[in-house]
Amino acid sequence: MDDHKRPLYLPFAGPAILEAPLINKGSAFTDEERVFFNLEGLLPHVIETIEEQASRAYDQYTNFTNDLDKHIYLRNIQDTNETLYYRLVQNHITEMMPIIYTPTVGMACERFSKNYRRNRGLFISYPNKDRIDDLLNNSTRQKVKIIVVTDGERILGLGDQGIGGMGIPIGKLSLYTSCGGISPAYTLPITLDVGTDNPNLLEDPMYMGWRHQRIGGEEYTEFVEAFMQAVHRRWPDALIQFEDFAQKNAMPLLERYKDQYCCFNDDVQGTAAVTVGSLLAACKAAKTKLSEQRVTFLGAGSAGCGIAEAIVAQMIAEGLSEEQARAQVFMVDRWGLLQDNMPTLLPFQQKLAQKCDDIEGWDNFSENISLLDVVNNAKPTVLIGVSGAPGVFSEEIIKAMHSHCPRPIVFPLSNPTSRVEATPKDLLHWTKGQALVATGSPFEPVVVEDETFEIAQCNNSYIFPGIGLGVLAAGAKRVSNEMLMASSRALAECSPLALDGEGPLLPPLEEIHKVSKHIALAVGKVAIEQGHALPCTDELLEQSIEDNFWTAEYRRYKRTSF
């Protein structure tokens, strides 16, 4: 029997049920339930279906004209009736995705303390560093299987938001459920409150976090270590997703823990996986292979380098040597092209720096080679922006790229919309509709010469829900690079443009459940092959995916004796 058909036995009654978001049904409680649980008189007379409730909620939602107000309204529903919240979001996923997550969630993070209404998740503050086990035991969620954790230092393109960064784990886990079918009862957002270096927050009397400069060095490392150990003691099988940590911490934390715990960094690995999946789809549409591309990045931080390493891995999988693959990837930051003689290269940048001997014959060769010079000399076929610098993909740069590449692949991925390197409208007009475009934020379709182009949003929500579902269904103990590569290939297999020669580069969000299940199967298979999960047949894995896929439907309640 499916879980939603099996009755749930509850040991409490009365107003307490209406205050519990995971079990509250509001006006959908039946006559029998209203009698058994002492709810008569606490609710209006009419008994509604969840669709009737969702219709009313959507009508209320459409009365708001401001995106932040819409976000706050949806969060209020989430905090009172989670099943209704997810039914509403799933009914309007394309419309509401930008409201519950990027770009609107950025505004919500900036105003988190001012708009605070009700607790959700855990705030683990540095002054409580010796009591982390106690704090985890205080969680209202007991069967946690997926955790998203941030320290709020690098929230989207907005920088240090302190505990305001909690909006990101809340939003990410909303997508795990609405896109990946993970039961909200299994999810827990966590913020590590280690202070903030944002002077506006420190001086704001409404700021609700620990009013202290950020800790760093050994203090920070020991605090995160204590947190990871405590989580493993409390929920040893939970998947931990690191989210929006600063560059100086993101890669070291990932390297330290990826082989100890079931964890991954979405900014580094999730972004890389969805980008590679989108590139594979674009290459299929252009009837070429990723290993035949020359790829230029603007932005050489942890996210950009994570994507680049994933591209290198895929090129190697397609038959190139590592040296050949790395020679086809060009990383540009604010100082110009990364070169192997630069003394300021970070450890994760070093393998991606171009050899000076290989490029000394370029026109305008110097210590600081600009993006335009890279385009003119390297002649890239792929241009990816993760810089957060708006408008830097200029008409001159794009036309220079198009002059040697009939179908340029251009991915301006920076979030939020105000930080995008170029708009799809400009990119398609400058290339007369020939560019293959995917963006990090949502954009409206573009019309060029009477042809309408749907703009694919290269959003991690295409990837991480499926990864989470696959890990959960297979019982995986680790998230390996091979599992991430499998998720990329599975996403590319769902591309309408690659499959049919028309339509968007990525499937519509209305098909996200199908996509997530397809990715979950691919991820689970690799986990089993690598020994990160117990052996099982493909049929059993598929059944486990279906069994673990939660849907927003009310369950019947029965009262236990008390």
Curated annotation (Swiss-Prot):
Gene name for this UniProt entry: maeA
Sorted UniProt keywords: Metal-binding, NAD, Oxidoreductase
NCBIfam families: PRK13529.1
Gene Ontology molecular function: malate dehydrogenase (decarboxylating) (NAD+) activity; metal ion binding; NAD binding; oxaloacetate decarboxylase activity
Binding of NAD(+), residues: 154, 267, 415
HAMAP family in alphabetical order: NAD_malic_enz
Catalytic activity: (S)-malate + NAD(+) = pyruvate + CO2 + NADH; oxaloacetate + H(+) = pyruvate + CO2
Residue positions binding a divalent metal cation: 243-244, 267
UniProt record similarity statement: Belongs to the malic enzymes family.
Protein name per Swiss-Prot or TrEMBL: NAD-dependent malic enzyme
Organism listed in the record: Shewanella sediminis (strain HAW-EB3)
Any one of the GO CC terms: cytosol
Residues marked Important for activity (site): 267
One of the GO BP terms on file: malate metabolic process
